[in-house]
């Protein structure tokens, strides 16, 4: 899909930690297999065959939305939205690269598999 938006624009006027978190996240997601980054006006979507995650940059942090088939019970989840019978959007605020841990990657990998 061709758009007028590029990934780099999402990091203008943002703290360097925002880019560090994004780069760390993308590096880990690459281990799942092939995927595409699709930049939009307000976010960057990560796609396998369909979108499995969305990344919105803020001044000092990232908002990661994971698209999954069941709610996640964790204090890390800031919002859960049921969008259909078996689909949930899970919102997680990431403020440091250290938050990209095994738990988060397990959730992302589940979403990646679901989107394939």
Q: Can you annotate each of these PLM segments?
A:
Residues 1-116:
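Charge-dense, helix-prone N-terminal extensions
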């Amino acid at each position: 899909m061709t758009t007028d938006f590029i990934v780099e624009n999402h990091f203008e006027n943002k703290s360097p930690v925002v880019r560090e978190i994004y780069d760390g996240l993308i590096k880990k997601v690459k281990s799942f297999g092939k995927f595409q980054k699709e930049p939009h006006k307000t976010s960057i979507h990560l796609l396998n065959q369909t979108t499995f995650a969305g990344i919105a940059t803020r001044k000092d942090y990232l908002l990661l939305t994971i698209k999954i088939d069941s709610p996640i019970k964790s204090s890390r989840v800031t919002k859960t939205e049921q969008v259909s019978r078996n689909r949930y959007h899970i919102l997680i605020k990431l403020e440091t690269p250290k938050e990209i841990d095994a738990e988060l990657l397990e959730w992302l990998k589940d979403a990646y598999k679901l989107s394939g």
